[in-house]
């Protein structure tokens, strides 16, 4: 069944809504669940069904192939400089040494290992670049297969503008 195939992070989000320490108001609040689309291509066959289920009571932030794409968007002119010229490589996201292509590209651009360097949090100061740059790629999570996709900056912008549903 679909419920058996639900990724653990959606189940976790649903469980957290019931956590009395959080005081989640189902009428007013939405849980934001952020994940990489590439996990579906490997592990979950029913991507569209999972997205539909997840969107039912949550806001889904999806990056394809991986979260490092969102991080890369925090740099001025990231689309023209880094994403557009490497689009095929980003989507295939093959290993470069011991890292996937997008992580390696991000590390080259930023000088930061996103998994280990705490200074990664400083990128929040550049989120306005991410909002502008993300508009240049696909933001439709329903059409992300085979496309460089991210909608995380859009969610942040919607929250800023009180448009998040």
Regions found by a protein language model. Give the residues of each.
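Short, small-residue-biased leader/transition segments that mark boundaries at the very start
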Residues: 2-6
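C-terminal accessory helical subdomains adjacent to catalytic cores in phosphodiester-
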Residues: 18-32, 37-165
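Glycine-rich, highly charged phosphate/nucleotide-binding loops
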Residues: 11-19
